């Protein structure tokens, strides 16, 4: 965002200390903080554009910090995001739910979808991807074993970018 909007003041936060440390090291000059989406360390109505990438929706807090006429960009997994991975992990793989687009205090503007496939060359690469997903915390031992033993495979990636304007 800083490169696309050079006059913008950009900051970032994440609940993970490791993620904040990595981001601060990579993006010198941009302030980062360890914080929850449910307690954003910014003033009321101070944000022109808020982005939320694969994090829980903190609707009331987002409405508090985004100024009227400002925007909220919500990146969520599409219905078939990582479906090939789920076919290995689960006996009955499932699609992700289609996200609702109505949030109090915001007007839905549009949905942009990105769809593609990625190749995972072996079980090690698959395990690296798996560790970054919520499936890591809720998959049984048998599913993990199948993934560790997986050869090369492809999986879909599906991202929905939902754009909202603050009322």
What are these regions (language model features)?
Residues 71-104:
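Conserved class I S-adenosyl-L-methionine
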Residues 21-22, 43-45, 82-88:
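Short, charged, surface-exposed secondary-structure boundary motifs
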Residues 1-40:
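Class I SAM-dependent methyltransferase SAM/SAH-binding core
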Residues 6-7, 27-31, 55-57, 68, ...:
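Short glycine/proline-enriched coil/turn segments at helix->beta-strand junctions
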Residues 54-55, 77:
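Short glycine-/small-residue-rich Rossmann-like dinucleotide-binding loops
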Residues 48-51:
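Hydrophobic beta-strand segment of the Class I
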Residues 57-73:
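A short glycine-rich, Lys/Arg-flanked "PGG" loop and its adjoining helix->strand segment in the class I
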Residues 114-167:
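Conserved Class I S-adenosyl-L-methionine
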């Amino acid at each position: 965002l800083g490169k696309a909007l050079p006059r913008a003041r950009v900051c970032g936060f994440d609940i993970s200390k490791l993620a904040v440390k990595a981001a601060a090291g990579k993006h010198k000059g941009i302030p980062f903080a360890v914080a929850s989406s449910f307690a954003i360390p910014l003033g009321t109505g101070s944000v022109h554009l808020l982005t939320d990438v694969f994090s829980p929706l903190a609707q009331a807090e987002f409405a508090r910090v985004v100024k009227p006429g400002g925007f909220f960009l919500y990146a969520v997994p599409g219905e078939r995001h990582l479906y090939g991975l789920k076919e290995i992990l689960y006996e009955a793989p499932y699609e992700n739910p289609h996200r609702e687009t109505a949030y109090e205090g915001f007007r839905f503007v549009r949905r942009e979808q990105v769809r593609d496939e990625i190749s995972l060359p072996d079980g090690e690469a698959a395990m690296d991807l798996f560790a970054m997903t919520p499936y890591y915390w809720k998959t049984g031992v048998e599913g993990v074993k199948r993934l560790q033993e997986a050869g090369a495979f492809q999986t879909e990636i599906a991202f929905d970018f939902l754009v909202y304007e603050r009322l």
